[in-house]
Structures are given as C-alpha cells and as structure tokens.
Regions:
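Conserved NTPase motor "head" modules and their coupling/switch loops across ABC/AAA+ ATPases, GTPases
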Residues: 2-135, 144, 148, 152-163, ...
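H-loop/switch region of ABC-family ATPase nucleotide-binding domains
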Residues: 167-169
Length: 172
C-alpha cells in the first residue's frame, strides 16, 4: 500500500501544479481581454491545506504520504480517499476592486461570468494549438443577456476569430 500511496502523492502533485498553472493562465486571459463580457477571477480553495502552497515535489510527496498514512482508517471506513487533490472548491468572483462571489450574483451575471471563462479558455486553446480555430457552440446565451452584454458577446466572437454557433429559441 505504501507504493500506491507514493504514486497517489506523485500524481496528486502533478495534478495540483497543472491545475494551478492553468487557473493562472485562464485568470490572465480574463484580465487581458479588452471586451470582457463580465470581469471575473477564478480561485481554487483546497480542503487539504497541503495544496494551499506551492512547494517542491519531494517535500510535497513526503508530506502527502504522511497524511495518507494517518488517514488510512478513515479512508477504509469511508471507502474513498478523503484527502485528495480532487477535494476542492472553485470560487469565482466578479469585479476588479470590490470582488463579489459568484454565488451572490444574479443568474444573468453568473451566466456572463461563465461566458467570459469560456472565451478565456477558447483563447488559450487557440494560442496553444498553433492559432488553429476553435469551434464554439453557445446555447441559449442571448435569452440571459441584456443588450450591452449581447454586444460584448458579439465583440468577443469577432476577436476570437473562430467558428461560433449561437442557438436558442427566441428570435433575438
């Protein structure tokens, strides 16, 4: 079981580092967009505080193996890993100076934030894929956006310079 715990710790380290890196990249794209639909930021909140700080791989693996060992009985009783890199809350906040958690925003603001994140990810994919076009399918977005945000959505689509399909049941 010790070798399995070591493998879990090593893979968890790589997942943690990757997740942190791509969250930073998405946040940079969200900050650098000139026509953001809604300005927002993503924060990762791990239940296991070991994942709170970036530390060297060897130290991380060593500390995580110790935690896995201490929690073997709990994990056995619950029939799952309780301290995994998967135990995370993803918090999204709207705004730049006075940030508001997404859970306190209107459903329209939440949808606008989601669209902003989708465009940030699409931009990242396009940049990392030799500028090849991405294909976006945006379903029922117009029904939830006011005129100002609809214009911003159209501008985002133009700036992305890729294929986009907007679907919905209303004529807007």
């Amino acid at each position: 079981i010790t070798s399995i715990e070591k493998k879990i710790a090593e893979l968890s380290y790589y997942l943690f580092i990757s997740r942190h890196k791509y969250t930073q990249l998405i946040n940079e794209k969200l900050q650098n967009r000139s026509q953001l639909i809604t300005l927002c930021q993503i924060e990762l909140d791990y239940k296991n505080k070991l994942f709170s700080n970036q530390i060297e791989k060897d130290e991380f693996v060593h500390l995580y193996i110790q935690e896995l060992y201490k929690n073997r009985d709990i994990d056995l009783k619950s029939n799952r890993l309780n301290l995994g890199v998967n135990s995370i809350n993803i918090n999204i906040q709207m705004g730049e100076d006075e940030k508001i958690e997404a859970k306190y925003c209107s459903s329209g603001e939440q949808k606008s934030m989601l669209i902003s994140i989708i465009f940030a990810v699409a931009t990242l994919i396009k940049e990392r894929n030799n500028k090849n076009h991405v294909i976006l399918l945006i379903d029922e977005a117009m029904a939830h956006l006011d005129d100002k945000h609809k214009e911003k959505l159209y501008e985002e689509i133009r700036q992305l310079n890729s294929h986009a399909w907007l679907t919905g049941v209303s004529s807007d």
